[in-house]
């Protein structure tokens, strides 16, 4: 399937969710015809929360090895996936990415140092601000394109990091990240209720996901 879809840009979405009893599944999906289709996952013991960066890297590497050489890829992720190690790995694969980052994130741009929320405090709903050649975190990782997107009818702006050149395209693609939330709802409250399974072994849960997906 991936080889067939790779004739066009592959939009991948990564996220984690509680499964079974005391386990979390980190999953990577491909967006196809409005749905998020699971491609690969890793299950670990642990409570709901951010997975270790090493697990992020392992999953992305696993999917990279499945793709045909030269595939055009955009990876989407929420604030869990704004780590610089993951961004560097994605760059090494020659993929594009659009990931959310927190409002308290440190930014260096045009010789100035400030937090992401400083941008949001200066704009109104319906505004998109793009800071090119920005560096983020205290380690000044970059350059990246930092976006502050405040959609109309929303209470606060969204802060995104990307290596894409087109700010509007990056925002449009990031909206597809929500497709993975629909998948998790289908597997939980509207479907297999994986979060209520009493299975606590990561290996068994990984196999169960094969059947559920």
Kindly label every feature range from the protein language model.
Residues 5-10, 21-23, 32-213:
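Single, function-defining residue in the core of a domain
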Residues 13:
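Aromatic- and Gly/Pro-rich donor/ligand-binding loops
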Residues 29:
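Nucleic-acid-interacting cores, centered on viral/eukaryotic replication and modification enzymes
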